[in-house]
Each structure stands twice: as C-alpha cells, then as structure tokens.
Amino acid sequence: MADTLCIAHLFDEAVQQSKKTLQMDPNFAIGHYELGQAFEQKHMHDQAIAEFQKAIEVSGHSGVFDSNLAYVYAVLGRKEEAIKIAKDLEAQHDQNPSAEANIALIYVGLGDQDQAMLWLNRGYEARFNPSILLRPAFDPLRSDAQFKDLLRRIGLPR
C-alpha cells in the first residue's frame, strides 16, 4: 500500500503506512524499502539511507535495495558511492531480471539521462516489469522524448 501511495505522490501517507507495517514486523525488508522511498521523496535523505541500509541488513543485498540506496547517494552528490553500486549491478545484470531498471534509477539520480534511457531500453528489450517507471524518482525523465516513447511502447500513461 505504501508503494501505491508513493506513486500517487502521497508521501506523508506512505510514511505513515510504512511505519504501521514496520510496527507489525520490524524486520520486514519491503517495509523499510517503502519507508526509504517515501523519505527520499520528502527530501529526508539521511532517514532514507538508514531505511535502505536496514532493508539490506535484514534481507541481504538485492538490486532493488542497493539501487535505491545508490539513488539517494547520487542525489546527495555522493557520486563515487552511487557509481560503484551501479557498476556492481551492471556486472551482475545478466543474473537479475530487473537489473536494467534498477541501474537506470541510479543514473536518474546522477542526472545522466542518456545512461538512464540506455538501461531502460535494455530493460524493455529484456521484457522488464515496467511498473518501476511509475515511481516519482523517474519524474525527471517524464519530459524526455525517449522516455515518452518508451512509455508509449509499453502502454503506460504518459
């Protein structure tokens, strides 16, 4: 539910929902991930980093958790850390079916739209789950003609 609230740009509600979820199960990695996303969109970067790190701590590394952590690093200007995670994910992308979109997310945070679109198009060719494109983190690409074309090809609203 918190994920849907974030997509709707209802970040305060997403924080509340995530906190309720984590009250029921403090070790629920997805709850920490969703709380991290909401915090990031509220520009509460330190809290977002803590939540993504907690998600990684309780469940191990995953492309989703690692890429969201790298996205926050990128937004904060911690480019070396973000790029290191991106390169690690790039090296493993053949074993991870959603890696392309996760890598693209990092490049969005870095402000590199060309690399973001390169990875999103690779994801499209690999038949990735396009729901990630609804996330607010991809808002900086919404005016890009290539991104609009990708959404059209997928059948998502532009």
Language-model features, listed with the residues they occupy:
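Alpha-helical protein-protein interaction modules
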Residues: M1-R158
